[in-house]
Structures are given as C-alpha cells and as structure tokens.
Amino acid sequence: MNLWTKIFQPPRHIKEISDPELVKKQYKYWRVRIFYSMFFGYVFFYFTRKSFTFAMPTLIADLGFDKAQLGIIGSTLYITYGISKFVSGVMSDQSNPRYFMATGLIITGLSNIFFGLSSTVPLFVLFWGINGWFQGWGWPPCARLLTHWYSKSERGTWWSVWSTSHNIGGALIPVLTGIAIDYAGWRGAMFIPGIICIIMGFILIDRLRDTPQSLGLPAIEKFKKEDLSHPHEETTADILEEEAERELSTKEILFTYVLSNKWLWFLSFASFFIYVVRMAVNDWSALYLIETKNYSTVKANLCVSLFEIGGLFGMLLAGWLSDTISKGKRGPMNVVFSLGLLFSILGLWGTHDRSIWWADGAFLFIIGFFLFGPQMMIGLAAAELSHKKAAGTASGFTGWFAYFGAAFAGYPLGKVAQDWGWHGFFVALLACALIALLFFLPTWNASEQSLRKHSH
C-alpha cells in the first residue's frame, strides 16, 4: 500500500443499519452536516484563490511591478488550476473527500503565506502556481459528495444552492482583503486568508465524511426509493443491469461522445470567451476603478463584490428559467444572457468619464447577473448533451477551455491594458462577449434527442 492510498483511500462500507427510523434520522443529520461543510469549505477556497487579485493595486505601489508582470502571475494560477481540475478529478474519484478537500485547502493556505513572504516575480509565480494546483482539489470532492448524498430528483436544487458558494466567497474576499490592506498592507491580505484557510482545513477533517455506506447507511437511491428510469430509455432494471455489464471504453467516451460531438465544441469555445470576460472583470475592474476614478481600495472592492452578488442571482434565475421557460434546453437562456452581457459591458464603459460609484457598482452587478448564468449552464449543458457515462469527461473538456480563457485574462489582457489603455481593454471584453454569443447561437435547439440524431 503506497502513501497516497494509505492517506486518501476511501473508507470501506460497513454493515447497514437495520432500523428504518434510525436510518432516516442519521441521513437527515449527515446530509445537513456534509452540505454546510463542503459549502463553507468551498467559500474558503475562494479566499486563497482571489487574495492576490485584490492585493494587486497595493502590491504595484509597494514593489513597482507593471501590469504585464502581474498578468504573468495571474495566468500561472489559471494554467495550473485548469490542468489540476482535470487531473484532480481522476484522483478524487479514488480518494476520501474528507482528507482530499481538507489537504487542498491547507496547502492553498500555506501557498498564500509563502507568497506574502516573497518579493520577486519568480517566487510569486512559483507559489501562485502551487496554489493553483491545489485549488483544483476543491471542486472534485464536492462533486463526489453531491452525487452520493443527494438523489437525482433533488440534486439540481442542491447543486444550484451549493454553486452560490462561489459567489459568496467572491463577494467576501474583496472586503476581507480591503480591511487587511488598511491594517497590514498587501502582505497582510495574503497572510490572513492563508491562516483562516489552514484552520478551515482542519475543521473539514472533523466535519466531512465519505459515502453514506461508509456510515452504515443505504445508498441514496435505495433510501429515497427513487425510480431512475428516463423517458427516453428502457426500464430502470434493464438500464442498471446493462450499465453494470458494460462501461464505455475510454476510446468510446473520447471519440464517440466528446471529440466528435459538435455541441461540446460550440460550448467549449463559448466557455473560453465567457471565462475571459469573467476573469477580466473579476481581476482587473478594481484596478480600473482605482486608476481612472480615484476610488479607495475598499470602495473599488465593494463594487467588485456587487459583480459576484449579481452573479448569484443570475445563476439561480438562469437555471430556473431554462427548466421552466425553455423546458430543459439551456441554449435559449445562454443566448439571451450573453446578449444582456454585451449591453451591460457597454454600460460600464459608458461611465468611464464619470465617478459615480453606485452606478459603477450597479453595472458590475448587472454584468455579473448576465455572465454567471451561462457560465454555470455550460457545464450542465455539456453533461446533458453527452452520454451519461461521458458526462465527467464532457464537463472536464469544457473546463479546460474555460481555464485557458481565464489564463488569457491574465498576461494578454494585462498587456492590452498596458499598451492600449482601458479603452482597449473594454473593446477586447466586448469582442469576447460577442464571440461567445455567436458560439451559443447554434446550440439554441440542442437537446438529448438532437444528440442522438447526430450520433447515429
């Protein structure tokens, strides 16, 4: 047994509890405990992921770096995080989420502390790259827990509520770093999130567990007595038996259901450009407001918090509208929201010569609203528009493109802002939003049925 297996191996299933009342009571308790633990755990991952973003303006003043150098540091995280998201997904499937998620959070905390102790670009790149790799340990264990503890019929609701942890983390970190900078400079803005996340990592070890079966509880489908049949498929028993008999080969997943799936290519390219806009607004808008409108760090960061809060509402509404108005098709809402994104970016750019902080905050709120809807639904649509046995690979495929887009928002956009000023920056954002819209358009009527016609 190697060290990895010894530390991270999932616990064995234990004998199932026979008392139905005790099972019900235990399930209720553990579902609540597991959910709040992974929810707040992921909020804290955001603290160590975004600390540098909001420490940037003060770091420029202290160390004299230019935007291109800062862009290199920012891009490093997105590249290592993008690769890790895929690799860690495979690793996490064979690991106990209790230790996997906690270890990731503790190491991101340490990376932030070492970053705060550094003063040169190579060291910043090293520690921010390590941070990016272990940031990839946050999402996969949550996916495992959401799948094991919440049944198919309710998972959408739990998934959307869990997804708001991104926005809550994103909204809190500007405030936390703003206060830390006022009292302890940019280094304090790295130390404080780092220390908090190390503490939270140990709390996760205490609070989280693996599957229901590891606690003597039945599988969630058995507990919920859920009929897993699908309107387009044969009976549940037939399906389960067929799936047990034959898994798809890696070749089938990649070449039949992912690489040859036109919908995934459209979604992946859209994902690239949506993520350029998302990360550009998140990473550069505070600096834009400070440089062009002379806002204080706290006021600029408050405006960026509104971007995340807008995203929270947009995400929940987009999912609900795609279920009700467009009957489960994600394409129409992706197109409508992308159109709204174009106009809201134009609105923010239109206020460049006026310093009205509430107007800037309102436009950032609206941009977040229209951006986070399609960003959330790309992964959902990718999973739905591929074979169920290829859903993870399909989501990972769009995720790779997303984080290449995020990396593009670092050095390349930093260079654009450096050479062509903030007007050039906004032109680049508008171009990306328009291209994303064009890639969403062909997916307007995409559905499982249209995939079958395409595949056969």
UniProtKB/Swiss-Prot annotation:
Q: In its UniProt record, which GO terms are filed under biological process? A: phosphate ion transmembrane transport
An example molecular function term from Gene Ontology annotations: glucose 6-phosphate:phosphate antiporter activity
What Gene3D superfamilies has UniProt attached to this entry?
MFS general substrate transporter like domains
Q: Classify the protein's membrane topology as the record does.
A: Multi-pass membrane protein
InterPro entries registered for this protein in UniProt: MFS, MFS_dom, MFS_trans_sf, OPA_Antiporter, Sugar-P_transporter_CS, Sugar_P_transporter
Q: Tell me where in or outside the cell this protein is found.
A: Cell membrane
Give the stretches traversing the membrane. Answer: 34-54, 70-90, 113-133, 161-181, 185-205, 257-277, 302-322, 331-351, 362-382, 394-414, 421-441
**Which SUPFAM superfamilies does the annotation name?**
MFS general substrate transporter (SSF103473)
Indicate the family of this protein: Belongs to the major facilitator superfamily. Organophosphate:Pi antiporter (OPA) (TC 2.A.1.4) family.
Task: Describe the task this protein carries out.
Answer: Transport protein for sugar phosphate uptake.
How is this protein named in the record? Probable hexose phosphate transport protein
Species whose genome carries this gene: Chlamydia muridarum (strain MoPn / Nigg)
